[in-house]
Design a protein with these regions (language model features):
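A phosphate-binding catalytic loop at a beta-strand-loop-alpha-helix junction
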Residues: 154-173
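Generic low-polarity alpha-helical segments
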Residues: 68, 173-176
Length: 184
């Protein structure tokens, strides 16, 4: 957490410094305050600081507050996911991938705290976890149980985070027996 706390604190200072120029530069206070909220999340408030709701969206206040950050996150996802599938099947009815692939599924377990889900599928559960830090065991267990519940209903389930490489993969690896994973 310390590295991300330092990173977002550094951005707060940078953007606040730019805002000191006054005039139109005062707009830099918006991304500065967004980074301040992110720093607070990594300082100990956790994923709940980002206020992702049960419908996959953030509270209205946080959605406006974090808009500059959402734009950067979306650009980052586009960069890292260029030329690769947004989701892949890893076991029967279990897919892992980016939150951007959620619109293709009727069942989604969303572990992405930092980016909203714009179109909620019929069967949806959010277990928001912070990016780039070890997930809490209780959150992983909750996400695995939700995945199993949706999977038992016989529908394909997407477990997603921002890119589909970390948090979502951890949930899937905890839920799928090793023998059920593809060999390649």
């Amino acid at each position: 957490h310390k590295r991300w706390l330092a990173f977002y604190t550094g951005l707060v200072l940078l953007f606040a410094g730019l805002a000191c120029m006054g005039g139109a530069a005062l707009w830099w206070l918006w991304p500065a305050s967004a980074c301040l909220l992110l720093a607070a999340a990594y300082a100990g408030l956790g994923a709940q600081a980002l206020q992702k709701q049960a419908d996959g969206r953030h509270s209205a206040a946080v959605a406006v507050w974090l808009l500059p950050y959402f734009i950067v996150v979306r650009l980052n996802m586009a960069y890292w996911l260029r030329g690769v599938p947004q989701s892949v099947a890893v076991a029967e009815n279990v897919h892992v991938g980016s939150i951007l692939a959620a619109a293709e599924f009727a069942a989604v377990v969303d572990v992405c705290a930092e980016y909203p889900l714009f179109r909620r599928p019929e069967h949806y559960a959010a277990v928001p976890m912070l990016d780039m830090v070890p997930p809490e065991c209780a959150d992983l267990i909750r996400a695995v149980r939700l995945l199993e519940q949706m999977r038992r209903a016989g529908r394909p389930v997407l477990v997603c985070c921002a890119l589909g490489y970390g948090r979502s993969a951890a949930v899937v690896l905890l839920s799928v027996p090793v023998g059920a994973l593809p060999s390649k």
